Amino acid sequence: MASSMMASTAAVARAGPAQSNMVAPFNGLRSSVAFPATRKANKNLSTLPSNGGKVSCMQVWPPEGLKKFETLSYLPPLSVEDLAKEVDYLLRNDWVPCIEFSKEGFVYRENHASPGYYDGRYWTMWKLPMFGCTDASQVIAEVEEAKKAYPEYFVRIIGFDNKRQVQCISFIAYKPT
């Protein structure tokens, strides 16, 4: 028994110095003397850094009366030419255009506190998805038909990738007045 205790203390004695060499000292800290301790005493605002005057052209989104929708909702209403460019982008990516409409353009909970089918996330589809559509004017014509049929409804265009089975883009094409 004594021989086994001697062997274990010898092993511990040898392991001690090896562990202290395993952790390197922490180098690279600078002395606090190198950092200034006081703030600049000059209160002249002309010496403050600026971003080149871009702040004057920024606007704050009004918190009431203008709700945000989906993609591109921060822009002014899209013209027919702008819609055509977005639909061309959608078609160039081989996405299937789909038109949907809804009376309420926002998510709302009316029937239950938890999310469900009737909480405004799902809109009514206008006709069928436009499989095989190659021209933006076809999609714009369908949007115009939907606007005439439901003038008090929101109309949106969705780009659906049928290979990945996902919705890739969605934006409001028409907002009722």
Swiss-Prot record:
Pfam family, one: RuBisCO_small
Superkingdom field: Eukaryota
Chief site of localization: plastid
Transit peptide segment: 1-56
Induction: Accumulates to low levels when grown under continuous white light.
InterPro entries assigned: RuBisCO_ssu, RuBisCO_ssu_dom, RuBisCO_ssu_N, RuBisCO_ssu_sf
Record keywords, A-Z: Calvin cycle, Carbon dioxide fixation, Chloroplast, Photorespiration, Photosynthesis, Plastid, Transit peptide
Single GO biological process annotation from the record: photorespiration
Matches recorded under SUPFAM superfamilies: RuBisCO, small subunit
GO cellular component terms, A-Z: chloroplast
UniProt entry tagged with the keyword Lyase: no
Further information: This protein is coded by one member of a small multigene family.
Function (record text): RuBisCO catalyzes two reactions: the carboxylation of D-ribulose 1,5-bisphosphate, the primary event in carbon dioxide fixation, as well as the oxidative fragmentation of the pentose substrate. Both reactions occur simultaneously and in competition at the same active site. Although the small subunit is not catalytic it is essential for maximal activity.
HAMAP family: RuBisCO_S_bact
Family assignment from sequence similarity: Belongs to the RuBisCO small chain family.
Designated name of the protein: Ribulose bisphosphate carboxylase small subunit, chloroplastic 2
Natural source organism: Lemna gibba (Swollen duckweed)
